[in-house]
Structure formats: C-alpha cells, structure tokens
Amino acid sequence: MFLFEDLNVESAQAVKAEESPAQTVQSKEEQVPANSTDKVLVTHTKLLDVGAFNGVAKRKWNPKMKHYIIPRNAAQFSAQFDLINSDLLNLKLHEAFNYLTEAAKAKKNILFVGTKSKAVQELIQSIAERTNSFYINQRWLGGTLTNFKTISNSINQLKRLIHTRDNDLTKYTKKEQIMIMKKLAKLERFFGGIKDMQGLPHVLVIDDPIKEKNAVTEARKLRIPVIALCNTNSDPNVITLPIPANNYNIRSVTLLLNLLGDAVALAQGNPAKFAFKPDEEIDIPQLVKKETRTVVNRDRAGFNKKQPKAEEAAKPAEKKAEK
C-alpha cells in the first residue's frame, strides 16, 4: 500500500494487520483536529443512531476486515451481522478528516465518487457542490484517470457545447439544436462534475470501494490516495485510508460523507453541515420506500369484458321459445 506523498501526514499510513486495537486507540488523541478541543467531531450516539457500526451478514464478511470487527466470541456478538469496532471507526474517521483538511488548505483536487444508487448520486453531487470539489456520480468510465487525455477531449467538447448553447444556438436548425442538446445532456451527465478539474485529482473519496472497484484500481495504478467507507465485506488493503463503517445504510453514508465534506468546507472558511455539532442539530431523515402497488390485469380479471345488452340477451331466449 502506498503512502500519501503530497502531504506529510503520518496518519496516512495503513493500519498493519498485526497492530492490536488497543495500540491503535492509544494514538486516537493525536488524530483529533486542533479545532476540536472543545467539541467532538461526531458523537458515538449519533453514529449508533444511523447504524454506522453495523456490518454485513457474517457469511459475507471479508477476513481482511477482521482487525476492524468486534471479535466473534464476544458476549454481545449474537447478531447475524458483524459489528464494527467503534474506536477504530472514530480513529480512521479523524485521520481522514485531518488529511482532507490539509488537502483542502493546499488547494488539492478532491474527487468524490459514488454511483451506487440515486440517493448516493444526489448526496455525492450535493457534497461536492457545497465544498467546491469535483464529483462523479454516474457510471465510472474506463480510463477516467489512466486515460485522462482522452477524457479531457470529451470535457473540452462539453465546454464547447455549453458555449454554443449559451451563445450561438439560434443559428442552427431545429433538428440540429435537438441533436446538440442531446449530446450536451449526455456529456454533462458523465463529465459535468469534473469539467472544471485541472489535471488529475490528488485524492479520491469513495462511498463503496466494491461498487467503485474500477475507480480504486485506476487510482492505485497512478498512486492517487483513496479514502473509502469500507464495510465488513471490503478489502481494506487496497484502500489508502479505509474508514470501517456501514456503507449500505444511506443515513450512515450521509453522515460520514458529509463529515468528510465538512473537513474541506471548514478548511475553505465555509460553515460545516454536521461536524462538531450537537446531535439535535444533525437531522438525517429516514429514506421512506414507496409502497409497491399490485397491478391487476383487468382483462384477465374480467373487468373489461363487454356485458351483453338486454335486447341481445333476450334474442337467444326468444329463439328457444319459437322452437
């Protein structure tokens, strides 16, 4: 695993497998940001409320995450899913917070990546926009990092189409305008979040390294640091700074990614959304699923069958009477 080379941050070193949780927690105070002497980045109660410590089903776990999981022989370990060590979650969260703070102060390119669901896509975009960062929330296109020159050509095409839309669109025919707008919409969907990024990103922030494995692979090839929320089925060894946490629950992802975004916002002199705030000021609503509606085939159910008129129904009876 490579180290953070751009910034001299000791906390960027990966956790070694032989390191015990007790040894790791001893250095926890060193990782707390300087501005958090009077306040806590986020309380244990709030992390528990959003389910940040809940892992996946035990049968799906990755043995490489063993270091971050509460021992299976613990008395409280009776659930069907693994439980994440709360001290290690807090420790790695502070490390990531510190690193992003330094990266933002150094004017580094920070790229947020998340494509798993519509809720995650909207979350990634909102965090990037409020922190003046970059984002990719649609399907990761192969070569986004490793073939950035070709991607840059598409970005330049997007910028030209935006200029055309805003200035010269009226000189084209109606059909040409429709084609231009369709092309613009497609490019905007894939490259809108990175169209102003000058060069490669200096760090990636990812919600799910399994879903975004292509992004992780390309970043590793180019030795770009990756910060990611790693559930108990992830491989932390491929991530520069893994944060052991529940990345399946949208409330957990919303809290943790916004905290990482707050590191960037505070470094820029902007207000934080969740960081260092009391629990009552952190409102993360439950995602309400739409009720499933049962579609009835009215033809099969007999609702749309034409009923015979009274006169037509009487004719067969009259014929029988004549006979």
From Swiss-Prot:
Region feature Disordered, mapped onto this chain: 295-323
Gene Ontology terms: biological process: translation
Molecular function per GO: structural constituent of ribosome
This protein's GO CC annotations: cytosolic small ribosomal subunit
SUPFAM superfamilies xrefs: Ribosomal protein S2
Annotated keywords: Ribonucleoprotein, Ribosomal protein
HAMAP family xrefs: Ribosomal_uS2_B
PANTHER family named in the record: 30S RIBOSOMAL PROTEIN S2 PROKARYOTIC AND ORGANELLAR, SMALL RIBOSOMAL SUBUNIT PROTEIN US2M
Family statement drawn from the similarity comment of this UniProt entry: Belongs to the universal ribosomal protein uS2 family.
This protein's name: Small ribosomal subunit protein uS2
Organism of this sequence: Mycoplasmoides gallisepticum (strain R(low / passage 15 / clone 2))
